[in-house]
Amino acid sequence: MRLLSFKKSKIVSIGTELEFQIIDCSSLSLVSRSKELMRALKDMRYRDQIKPEITQSMIEINSSIHQSAKEMYDELLELQKILVETAASIDIAFCGGGTHPFQQWTMQKIFPSKRFKKKFNQYRYLSKRATVFGQHIHIGCPTGDDAIYLTHALARYVPHFIAISASSPFYLGINTNYCSSRSTIFNAFPLSGVIPYLRNWQEFSDYYRKMYRWKIIENMKDFYWDIRPKPELGTIEIRVCDTPLTLRKSILITAYIQALALYLLEEKPVELSHDLYYVYNYNRFQASRHGLEGELTVTDKDRPIPIMDDILETIKKIEQYINELGNNEYIEELYSDVINKQNDSVLINKMYKQDGSFSKLVAAQCELWLSDSKDRKWMTQPS
């Protein structure tokens, strides 16, 4: 079979998608107002980079393509500014975090687009239950073979990405005792989890065409894998991260993945084999449940190692590429967070313990979301 086309990209160019919670300013609950928000944004600059998601209490911002994490950060701040200005006119707010702490998914409304209606008819309750919020990170690859190698090689580091981004300890009004409860939600979807062990772009092309011919998929979006190729963009897409509480944290995560990807593509240090996936689900669980304090099983070692230690060692190992990309400032901040066992899940638990109020927690998350913005017009003081 002929190869699927793959758009050539600059090596480790970056892009990101961030899903945010739409919050009612009075009740601090999720509110289904993305239709109204999209209408209000109709004539705004960057309109095409702000999109609805499958349920109406979600909104997504998309960056453009960048080589520099700093340039991406500047653009995200501009997108945030537009959201904040628009929110003020219709009395809503936004926050980060992988889950809303007390929402009930049964109350969510599907966004009335043709694609989302079709998905709801296919997956029914799973679609509403997927009202959780993530950051997706795109990494540019020169060729399809590079994309397949990177998809597999990054699987070794998925526990890192879950642990550093974890921001969803509360769900449906309970403490889940997971650092990232969001990362467990998509397991029920078909074609979730990991890509099959396909060794090159030819094998992936053959697999894709079979799945299409069998009418299991219609396009690449039907794969819900943790990491998936995006040939129309010339990228691979990492989909395991919770939405951070701040835009800056989203940049720390992106900067780390960018430098790691450059190291992997330049040096090819990960030997691809089925062994990568023998331990994958267990390592993923460790990161979802315990975050930075979880353990990681590496196939060439005899005993588990702490996820935190593995991240710190990896940062030292890829220092050359961090310097080359100019990501030092962001990685130094991330290193400090990791060595101090700090992620957003830890912070959310700490904020909740101060008052024991989910409403006050959401208000604090809304304030944190604005902390690196130029516009802090919105504030609420829940009773």
UniProtKB/Swiss-Prot annotation:
Enzyme class: ligase
InterPro entries (alphabetical): GCL_type2/YbdK_subfam (IPR050141), GCS2 (IPR006336), Gln_synth/guanido_kin_cat_dom (IPR014746), YbdK (IPR011793)
GO BP term, pick one: modified amino acid biosynthetic process
Catalyzed chemical reaction(s): L-cysteine + L-glutamate + ATP = gamma-L-glutamyl-L-cysteine + ADP + phosphate + H(+)
EC number(s) given by UniProt: 6.3.2.2
ATP-binding among keywords: yes
Signal peptide: none
Pfam family, one: GCS2
GO MF annotation terms: ATP binding; glutamate-cysteine ligase activity
UniProt keyword annotation of ATP-binding present: yes
Keyword annotations from UniProtKB, A to Z: ATP-binding, Ligase, Nucleotide-binding
Assigned protein family: Belongs to the glutamate--cysteine ligase type 2 family. YbdK subfamily.
Chain's role: ATP-dependent carboxylate-amine ligase which exhibits weak glutamate--cysteine ligase activity.
Protein's name according to its UniProt entry: Putative glutamate--cysteine ligase 2-2
Source organism: Legionella pneumophila (strain Lens)
Lineage of the organism: Bacteria, Pseudomonadati, Pseudomonadota, Gammaproteobacteria, Legionellales
